[in-house]
Amino acid sequence: MWLIVGLGNPGERYARTRHNIGFRSVDTLAERHGLTFRPQRANSQLAEGNIYGQRVVLAKPQTYMNLSGQAVVALCNWYKIDPARELLVIYDDLDLPFAKLRIRERGSAGTHNGMRSIVAQLGTTEFPRLRVGIGQPPGKMDAADYVLGRFTPDEEAALPDLLGRIADAVEVILREGLTTAMNRYNPL
């Protein structure tokens, strides 16, 4: 079983912001595989089903980004998830160029407050993650304003392809494992 968590902030105000690329990623996976998000459990919207023979739970924490760890820990406990082998977190990354994907088996939280919350609540950095590049803020723009801002029109036009590649990468993880997915998507 896999718990696949897309990070974001709840509410229409944040729906199309850079910080919500994780939510949009799990929405794309759900749509592709005919899964429907249902009312909350453990402060999350959930969609459950099978993807390529793997039981999956897609989750969108509704705790706001900075408290994502509360929802992730509650879900890991509820579903008896081993984070090192059965958790995948998808989130935005300022340190990667727009549309660059980076899959890792483990690693630090970096500057991402949602990941900091998850690491603090789980007490470990030993869990897989898929980082999605959103690029750096232009000029002297504040990072918080940037991540809570909307994509440019050119970026928004590129999102369907990007979200498709993210879904493809997750499917490779489920079918062939993390190493194969890292080898296939990290160099691009």
From Swiss-Prot:
Record lineage: Bacteria, Bacillati, Chloroflexota, Chloroflexia, Chloroflexales
Residues that coordinate or bind tRNA: 14, 64, 66, 113
Matching InterPro entries: Pept_tRNA_hydro, Pept_tRNA_hydro_CS, Pept_tRNA_hydro_sf
Alphabetical GO biological process terms: protein quality control for misfolded or incompletely synthesized proteins; rescue of stalled ribosome
Site (Stabilizes the basic form of H active site to accept a proton): 92
GO MF annotation terms: peptidyl-tRNA hydrolase activity; tRNA binding
Record family assignment: Belongs to the PTH family.
Name recorded for this polypeptide: Peptidyl-tRNA hydrolase
